[in-house]
Each structure stands twice: as structure tokens, then as C-alpha cells.
From Swiss-Prot:
Binding-site residues for ATP, renumbered to this chain: 87, 105-109, 515
Organism for this UniProt entry: Burkholderia cenocepacia (strain ATCC BAA-245 / DSM 16553 / LMG 16656 / NCTC 13227 / J2315 / CF5610)
Subunit structure: Monomer and homodimer. Part of the essential Sec protein translocation apparatus which comprises SecA, SecYEG and auxiliary proteins SecDF-YajC and YidC.
GO molecular function terms listed in the Swiss-Prot or TrEMBL record: ATP binding; metal ion binding; protein-exporting ATPase activity
Designated name of the protein: Protein translocase subunit SecA
Enzyme Commission number(s): 7.4.2.8
Lineage, uppermost ranks: Bacteria, Pseudomonadati, Pseudomonadota, Betaproteobacteria, Burkholderiales
Length: 933
């Protein structure tokens, strides 16, 4: 109550910020008259002036009013668009590293030009991040005219581009691209073997469009670069026969033995998207697998040798019970393609991890692709937190403001609309069954059609959109369907969705990137005429004018009919997605309306609020076809959505806490990798490693401070001879001296190792040998890092079981991950030292041959794939990995298998030698993992 009272007096934080920014807008507006008087050349010259002032130490904040005024004037001249005052406020919000919530149609693309221009003046690069290649290319080409006029260069970073093109794109002042491509480039840059093979510069400033979609919806899904691992194709096919033979148990057994309505072999937890075998299910599965010869008679599925089979059983069960065709995936050209549950788009090239995708392929009887081994991975949460400054814009961020602040430290500012909104959001209507709901939807659509009002119908799955399309055909209502299957025609359909009597069915409208203009999009049609070279210029002008006149008439006609009407056929788990659908209507002060039609069969209602609403309907004795339309029910649904959002936030936060562990380790490895690439000579590093490894070997047989009776000299001699190519007569030394110490033996072995090393260097030359050492070191680091990622993944899968032993799983994960990391660093030192000491080199040519062999060892990883696998929704673990035992054994002779391709990535923030080590040990970096470098 006190908070509300104080807000009335002082206003909310949002209002205070907007008020503060309005003062700066007044300063910018005051400059407009003098900026307007400048010639084009003088206006362009302002960029050079600003750059010089920044180079002289003037801050961007101080430059903001002038730079924004120049950008606005340039936009007016080049794009024929002048930024509104509220757009200037949006630009300031982005410049100060916050999230701007701007309603659909308020011109987010134009708003971004202000902070992008200002920050590009510093010359450190600005990234504009969009959700797909189409939008990246469209926005870059559209806004490049403005930036080029102002003397700035623009690059586009698209998937499938050549290495040189990518380097040029990143070298530009402003780079447009997708979140996936920026992330993959960062990972690839940390897999290269030459410094000039990198493409990214330091991560300076990013403006993220549709920030909620990228930083929240996709936060649970890591970017994964993977290569092929072992082949289990036959096993997936055989396991596919199991789920149809098992029955689902209805109800869950309680402590008193009650609760099971119908016994069965497995239970489904739809809320957590998991499936579990019951006791009888285990017995039945074991019996069937024994009959098929997959396990021995009387063997348990939990026997060590059958753990892999257990994994396949659960993958097959999940594929059959939790993942449904045309809802979670489609089958296209003989492949299973994932459907993004938030946007309804097809995610070609992405695969579910942990064998789930292969299980779905087996279920659909299409070709089963090989499983993969993770080479590198990162989540968007950790990638975007590496930027020195991050900002974002979206139409719907306020519901997730807490999460943006908690995880990314980003404040959300709601920007006022340029014109007051006129959309009417009607009460939800809830029906008992899906049939009654669809009947009501068809009635509403018919009513709008007869009145000439355009309708956009939102569905949550392809299956529902096709069902509704079928019902509309039966009702004789012409319509367009916009879902993942119609990707190519998408922009054209959206452009015309605002015409009179137009009916458009769409899976979730998030990230579509095209405004629905009342009366249709005349600009798009005009662009087609403009691009047609066969039409004479005067005829073009006449046709375009006629087009605009027709549009004016249609525009007024649609406004009179009530504007665009939005119909939601189901509530989404997230209020934000519902708001995105609603936000398509009422753009820039146009009229519009929205209504959601729900049924008690909807997953959200059934899982979270069904019983309560059903009891209300039963008490009211609602006749068939009658709907509930009450605030209490709508509030009940919103409460259910809030619960789901809170649960999803907890999942993302928990995931981040686990991922932070591997992220800290990734920072150490990538920093050391970059230091290796940039160092001219790594002799000191190699020498320190050799001395450390030799010391460990000697201490095994001749402990520090020990006496002769405790030594095992014959074993030491054998170990040095077999493993390190050092043939030393240590026993003779001991026999000849009556007072030799353990330290003297260590010194003798170390000296012999140094002499052997120097002899090899002398044979081929310092420069050649140093290049060989760098190659060995990089390959070893990469291979052992891959195996470490697999080990972390296996650790992550089973860590929750520590809770049963009254231990904190997160703390246990951190502790064991640190131990694994320390073991990996030791293994790197051992492996590199062994290779360098064992390699037999007579000439520089032989050395080159050895280096080539090292490169070729990565052959089994040549089929590299880039994935953004939705493992969280699949209930699958973080990385799609199969243990690389084969990869480990292949390295026993000379060196481990290696990456065979180079590529992109950004510079790691440096860890100072006296800073705390990022691994979390509490020690200084130089005394912990910094020892490696």
C-alpha cells in the first residue's frame, strides 16, 4: 500500500526514466533546425568529426544528442522516415544497455539505427542480432542506405558464407546476423589453428531484436558443434518395437497404495515432459529384450553392461509418448524436422540430443542419422553475457522483466506508444470440449468475414492449424495458412493479412518480422512493380499511384469494420506469446480487437487449471455449446500461466548455474588456446610442462625427501625407457655414490630430458619445431576438451541422485567438475610431453609429415554439424554426446585426433594472473589453472 502511495506521488521507475529521457529529446529537437541546414556532404562529414572527438576521449554519452540529431536528419533524407520522439527515447534506452519494450508497429528497426550509429563511431564494431537470415538480410539492406550515407560500413553475417566474406562482415562498422551464426562463429574461432583464421573481433556492443525470443525462449537450448560418434542405428530400429507393447499407467501410486486408476508399464509426467517405467514395465521390458536376444536371460536392465540399452529404451519411449508428428516435428523429404514450439517455424538442421532424434526417426521409419559427439558448445545466456554492452528490443518484455534483470542484469523500460492504442481485448470464452470451441471460432470468423473485417487466427501447433483449415473449408470460408510448412510464402501472406475479408491462420506469430497493415501492404506490392524492368518508368509511377489510392480506400474500409480481429484458439504456456499474438492488432493507433477461445481439453488447462474450471462449469450446469466468460476463470488461467513461467524460469536459472561451471572452464581453455595461437615461441610452456611431468614420474619411484631403501630404481629406469625414450643408468649412479639424494636423481633425469629435447630442436631448427609443438598442443587441448565435455555431460545426467544421499547436487557437480578439469589439465601436460619426447625426427620434412599426421587424426570428426538442439523441452541433457572411447584409444601412439576444419570466434575476456581463477577453486589464476600457460 505504501509503495502504491509513493508511486502516485513520484511515479514508477519506468515513468521517471522516460521523463528523464524526454529532457534529452528536447535537447535533440533543439538541434534539428541547425542540422537541417547542412548539405549532404556536411551531414556526412559529421561522422568524421564525431570519430575524432571520440578518439580524443569524449564519451559517447556526451555525443548522444548531436549524433541522434544527425542520424534522424539522415534518415529523413535517405529513408524518407523521421524518428518520432518516442523512438528517440527507445534509442536512448538501447544505448544505455537496457531493454526497450515497444509495441508492434512502432518501428523497432528504425529505432535501432540511433544507438547503432552512435556506438559504431567508437570503431569497435556493433552487432545487430535478429532471429533469422531473412530478417538480417532485409534489415541490413534496408538500413545500409542510411549507414553508408553517413560514411559507415555494413556487413551481413549469414550461415553458409565463405570464410573471407565473414571476415569482411565482422570488420565492418556494423554487422547484421542471426543469434545462431554469431554464437557458432565464436565457437569456431576457438577451434582454429591460425590467428588469421578467426573472423570475430572483441565482443563490444550487441542490439538484440526480439530479445525475449533469443534470451529467454532459446536460453535453454545450447549451440552445439558436433562430429559423428559411434553408430547405434540397428539398436534404435529394434528398440522402436518396444513402446507399442507397453501400456500407460493412469494415475500415480500414493504412499498408502492408492491412486492408480489403471495399472500399466509406464507413467507420463506431461508437466516435466518425462516418462518413467513402472516396476511391471521394467519386468516386461527385460522379458521382451531377453526374447529378442538383446540382454541375457534373467539379466537386469540396470546391470553395468546394459546401461546403454536403458538409454535406448527411454529414448524410444519418449519418442512414442511425448513427441507427436505435426506438433513437435514434421517429416519432410524423408527427414524428421523439429518445429519450434514458440514460433511454429521449421528448424531445419537442428536435432534433439541424447539419441531422441534417432528414436523419432526410427518411429517414423525414415533414415536414421548417426549420433554425434560434442566438439564445442555454449548457451546464448553465456554468449551474450560476454558483450561489453548488451541491449535488446521487443514488443513483449515486461512479463519477463525480472528474469532479464536477474540473469543478464538488463533493465526493461516500457516505451510509450506514438499514438494511444485502440485495441479491445475481450474476455476469454471457455468451452467444455474442443469441438464446441472450434464451432464458436468458426461462428466468429464467419461474422467478421461477412462484415469485411480481416481475421488472424493463432494456433499453437501445425496440427491445430491444419484442423482449423479443414473446418474452414467445410464452412466454405476462403483462407490462407501460415505455418512452418509454408515458410517460403510467409512474408507475402503476412503482407496481405490486413485486407478486407482476409482470413489468415498462423502458428505462433513470434518473430515473423512483418507488420500487418490494415488494407494490405501497398509498399510490398509497389516494390514488385519497381523491380520489374519491363515496365516503362511513367507506367510504373501511374500503377504505384493507383495502388496507393486503392490502398487508402481499403484502409478506411477495414478501419470502419473494426480493424484486424485476433482469435486465439488456445492459451500458450507463456503470457508473452499470447501478448505477441494480440499485439498484431491495433498497430500505431489503428482499431483492432482480440479474443481467446479455450476448451478444458487444452494442455494448459488440463494440466494446471482444469479441475477447478470444470467444477465451476459443473456447478453452473452449463448446457452444451455454452461458454464461460468470467474474470475469475481468466484470472485462474493467467495464474496457471504464471506458475508455468515461474517453473520455466527456475529451469533456466538452474541450467545457467550448472552451465556456469563449464562456462568458467571454457573461459580458461579458450584463453590459453588464444595465448598459444598468439605466442611466437612456446618453448617456456613446453619446458615447464616437461619438468612438471618428469618430476611426477620420478616422484612415483623416488619420493621427495626419501632414503635409498624406499626407492624403486629398476622400475623408474623402465618407465623412463618405455614411456619417455630416456635410457639412463640410474642404478649405476646410485651404486657409485654413497650420498646421492632424491633431488639429485630428479636433476639428473630432468637434465637428460632437456638434452634430448635440445638435440631434436637442433636437428630441425627452432622455428620448425616450435610450429610442431604448437600443433601438438592445440590438437591435444582440443581432443581432451571434447572428452571433458562428454565427461561433464555424463556427470550432469546423474548428479541429481546425490540429493538422496543428503548432498547438494549443485555443490557436488561443481566439486567433481573441478576435479575433472584439473585431471584434464594434467592429462594435457602428460600427453603433450609424451608426444614431443617420443617423436623421432631426422629432418624438417619428417617434422612436417608428423604435423600432417596429427591433423589427419581428426578424420572421424570430419562430418561437422551445427545444432541448436532443444534438449530442455525433450527432457534431454545439455550436450548430445556419446562417450568418445574410440577417440581416446586412437591417440596412444603419437597424438590425439584433431579438428579438421578451421573457422570463426571472438576474443575471450582476459583473466589476469592475480585474479581469482574462474574455475571457482578460490586460488589465484597463476597458482591454479594458469600454470598450464
Amino acid at each position: 500500500m505504501t509503495t502504491g502511495f509513493l508511486q502516485k506521488i513520484f511515479g514508477s521507475r519506468n515513468q521517471r526514466l522516460v521523463k528523464q529521457y524526454q529532457k534529452t529529446v528536447a535537447t535533440i529537437n533543439a538541434l534539428e533546425t541547425q542540422i537541417e541546414k547542412l548539405t549532404d556532404d556536411q551531414l556526412r562529414g559529421k561522422t568524421d568529426e564525431f570519430r575524432q572527438r571520440v578518439a580524443a576521449g569524449e564519451s559517447l554519452d556526451k555525443l548522444l544528442p548531436e549524433a541522434f540529431a544527425v542520424c534522424r536528419e539522415a534518415s529523413r533524407r535517405v529513408l524518407k522516415m523521421r524518428h518520432f520522439d518516442v523512438q528517440m527515447i527507445g534509442g536512448m534506452v538501447l544505448h544505455y544497455g537496457k531493454i526497450a519494450e515497444m509495441r508492434t508497429g512502432e518501428g523497432k528497426t528504425l529505432v535501432a539505427t540511433l544507438p547503432v550509429y552512435l556506438n559504431a563511431l567508437a570503431g569497435r564494431g556493433v552487432h545487430v542480432v535478429t532471429v533469422n537470415d531473412y530478417l538480417a538480410q532485409r534489415d541490413a539492406e534496408w538500413m545500409a542506405r542510411l549507414y553508408n550515407f553517413l560514411g559507415l560500413s555494413v556487413g551481413i553475417n549469414l550461415s553458409g558464407m565463405e570464410h573471407d566474406q565473414k571476415q569482411q562482415a565482422y570488420a565492418a562498422d556494423i554487422t547484421y546476423g542471426t543469434n545462431n551464426e554469431f554464437g557458432f562463429d565464436y565457437l569456431r574461432d576457438n577451434m582454429v589453428y591460425e590467428t588469421d583464421a578467426r573472423v570475430q573481433r572483441a565482443l563490444n556492443f550487441a542490439v538484440v531484436d526480439e530479445v525475449d525470443s533469443i534470451l529467454i525462449d532459446e536460453a535453454r537450448t545450447p549451440l552445439i558443434i558436433s562430429g559423428q560418434a559411434e553408430d547405434h542405428t540397428e539398436l534404435y530400429v529394434r528398440m522402436n518395437a518396444l513402446p507399442p507393447l507397453l501400456e500407460r499407467q493412469i494415475g500415480e501410486e500414493k504412499a498408502d497404495g492408492t491412486g492408480v486408476e489403471k495399472p500399466g508399464d509406464y507413467t507420463l509426467d506431461e508437466k516435466a515432459r518425462q516418462v518413467f517405467l513402472t516396476e511391471s514395465g521394467h519386468e516386461k521390458a527385460e522379458r521382451l529384450l531377453a526374447e529378442w536376444g538383446l540382454i541375457g536371460e534373467g539379466e537386469s536392465l540396470y546391470a553395468p553392461q546394459n546401461i546403454t540399452l536403458m538409454h535406448h529404451v527411454y529414448a524410444a519411449l519418449r519418442a512414442h509418448t511425448l513427441f507427436h508428428k505435426d506438433q513437435h516435428y514434421v517429416v519432410q523429404n524423408g527427414e524428421v524436422v523439429i518445429v519450434d514450439e514458440f514460433t511454429g517455424r521449421l528448424m531445419a538442421g537442428r536435432r534433439w540430443s541424447d539419441g531422441l532424434h534417432q528414436a523419432v526417426e526410427a518411429k517414423e521409419h525414415v533414415k536414421i542419422q548417426s549420433e554425434n559427439q560434442t566438439l564445442a558448445s555454449i548457451t546464448f545466456q553465456n554468449y551474450f553475457r560476454m558483450y561489453a554492452k548488451l541491449a535488446g528490443m521487443t514488443g513483449t518484455a515486461d512479463t519477463e522483466a525480472y528474469e532479464f534483470n536477474e540473469i543478464y542484469g538488463l533493465e526493461t523500460v516500457v516505451i510509450p506508444t506514438n499514438r494511444p492504442p485502440k485495441r479491445i481485448d475481450k474476455q476469454d470464452q471457455i468451452y467444455k470440449t474442443a469441438k464446441e470451441r472450434y464451432d464458436a471460432v468458426i461462428r466468429d470468423i464467419r461474422d467478421c468475414y461477412e462484415r469485411g473485417q480481416p481475421v488472424l487466427v493463432g494456433t499453437t501447433s501445425i496440427e491445430n492449424s491444419e484442423l482449423l483449415s479443414h473446418l474452414l473449408k467445410q464452412a466454405g470460408l476462403p483462407h490462407e495458412v501460415l505455418n512452418a510448412k509454408q515458410h517460403e510464402r510467409e512474408a507475402a501472406i503476412v503482407a496481405e493479412a490486413g485486407r478486407p475479408k482476409r482470413i489468415t491462420i498462423a502458428t505462433n506469430m513470434a518473430g515473423r518480422g512483418t507488420d500487418i497493415v490494415l488494407g494490405g501492404n501497398a509498399e510490398k506490392q509497389a516494390a514488385f512493380i519497381e523491380a520489374d524492368d519491363s515496365i516503362p518508368a511513367d507506367e510504373k509511377a501511374r500503377r504505384i499511384q493507383k495502388l496507393h489510392d486503392e490502398w487508402e480506400t481499403l484502409h478506411e474500409e477495414v478501419k470502419a469494420a473494426g480493424g484486424l480481429h485476433i482469435i486465439g484458439t488456445e492459451r500458450h504456456e507463456s503470457r508473452r506469446i499470447d501478448n505477441q499474438l494480440r499485439g498484431r492488432a491495433g498497430r500505431q493507433g489503428d482499431p483492432g480487437s482480440s479474443r481467446f477461445y479455450l476448451s478444458l481439453d487444452d494442455p494448459l488447462l488440463r494440466i494446471f487449471a482444469g479441475d477447478r474450471v470444470r467444477s465451476i462449469m459443473d456447478r453452473l450446469k452449463m448446457p452444451e455449446g455454452e461458454a464461460i466468460e468470467a474474470g475469475i476463470v481468466t484470472r485462474s488461467i493467467e495464474s496457471a500461466q504464471r506458475k508455468v513461467e515461474a517453473r520455466n524460469f527456475d529451469i533456466r536459472k538452474q541450467l545457467l548455474e550448472y552451465d556456469d561451471v563449464s562456462n568458467d572452464q571454457r573461459k580458461v581453455i579458450y584463453q590459453q588456446r588464444n595465448e598459444l595461437l598468439e605466442a611466437h615461441d612456446i618453448t617456456e610452456t613446453i619446458t615447464a610442462m616437461r619438468h612438471g611431468v618428469i618430476t611426477e614420474v620420478v616422484r612415483q619411484f623416488v619420493p621427495e625427501g626419501s632414503i635409498e631403501e624406499q626407492w624403486d630404481v629398476p622400475e623408474l629406469e623402465e618407465a623412463l625407457r618405455n614411456d619417455w625414450q630416456l635410457d639412463l643408468a640410474i642404478q649405476e649412479m646410485v651404486n657409485e655414490s654413497s650420498s646421492i639424494t632424491a633431488e639429485e636423481i630428479l636433476d639428473a633425469v630432468t637434465t637428460a630430458a632437456d638434452e634430448q629435447y635440445e638435440a631434436k630442436v637442433a636437428m630441425v631448427g627452432r622455428e620448425s619445431f616450435s610450429a610442431f609443438e604448437r600443433s601438438v598442443m592445440l590438437q591435444t587441448v582440443d581432443r581432451l576438451w571434447r572428452e571433458h565435455l562428454a565427461a561433464l555431460d555424463h556427470l550432469r545426467q546423474g548428479i541429481h541422485l546425490r540429493g538422496y544421499a543428503q548432498k547438494n547436487p549443485k555443490q557436488e557437480y561443481k566439486r567433481e567438475a573441478f576435479e575433472l578439469f584439473a585431471a584434464m589439465l594434467d592429462a594435457i601436460k602428460q600427453e603433450v610431453t609424451r608426444i614431443v619426447m617420443n617423436v623421432q625426427i631426422q629432418s624438417p620434412e619428417q617434422l612436417e609429415e608428423a604435423a600432417e599426421q596429427i591433423e589427419e587424426r581428426g578424420g572421424h570428426l570430419e562430418n561437422v554439424e551445427y545444432q541448436h538442439a532443444d534438449y530442455a523441452d525433450a527432457g534431454a541433457p545439455v550436450a548430445n554426446v556419446t562417450t568418445a572411447a574410440a577417440a581416446a584409444t586412437a591417440t596412444a601412439d603419437m597424438v590425439g585426433s584433431a579438428m579438421t576444419h578451421g573457422g570463426p570466434g571472438g576474443e575471450m575476456p582476459k583473466v589476469g594472473r592475480n585474479d581469482p581463477c574462474p574455475c571457482g577453486s578460490g586460488k589465484k589464476y597463476k597458482q591454479c589453472h594458469g600454470k598450464l600457460s
